[in-house]
Curated annotation (Swiss-Prot):
HAMAP family with a match to the protein in the record: TarI
Descriptive protein name: Ribitol-5-phosphate cytidylyltransferase
PANTHER family the record matches: 2-C-METHYL-D-ERYTHRITOL 4-PHOSPHATE CYTIDYLYLTRANSFERASE, CHLOROPLASTIC (PTHR32125), RIBITOL-5-PHOSPHATE CYTIDYLYLTRANSFERASE (PTHR32125:SF8)
Top-level taxonomy: Bacteria, Bacillati, Bacillota, Bacilli, Bacillales
The keyword Lipoprotein is assigned to this record: no
Amino acid sequence: MIYAQILAGGKGTRMGNVSMPKQFLPLNGKPIIVHTVEKFILNTRFDKILISSPKEWMNHAEDNIKKYISDDRIVVIEGGEDRNETIMNGIRFVEKTYGLTDDDIIVTHDAVRPFLTHRIIEENIDAALETGAVDTVIEALDTIVESSNHEVITDIPVRDHMYQGQTPQSFNMKKVFNHYQNLTPEKKQILTDACKICLLAGDDVKLVKGEIFNIKITTPYDLKVANAIIQERIAND
């Protein structure tokens, strides 16, 4: 089976003094998360669409989805303490509720990236079915500088080899779950990216080309940019 998981477990502290997590903030009259989920319900290949939410915001998430979207594939579940635990909670939910096979894949995506395209979703599904681990990326536009002590430059990697990670990130569910279970508690604490889990296990991670407008709405400035993108699209329709 093919699952989508919308990662809406964060609290959005970088958004500043707001009354709710950033995924529920309005974007052109609808919550950001609704714009994102709308992209996924258009794809008929998904058997279920999981929305991972903070426990205290699950009812709010369900109410928002029901207000704007009618699709019985959608299930709101509890997120985890961090990004990777949220993904693993999704896999645990699937295993307990529907059962898990060797071929099941999951397409995980940030709730606050509402501008992903049908192409990106399709290529993630195809690549995950083929390789078992996928990251969506764009070429790095700026030179990347590394500093191990946060004071002086320790390395400047070749920009042609650098990419900026986006989402979706997609995985064979059994594989990534087993890799995660094999990590030490210390590794689990420091790893913030699920693709790194697969890399550490020796798996190849396929690259899917993202889009520069597939932005993550994290700060008030990002929200202004997102509104500008929508207004431009409305004007061009």
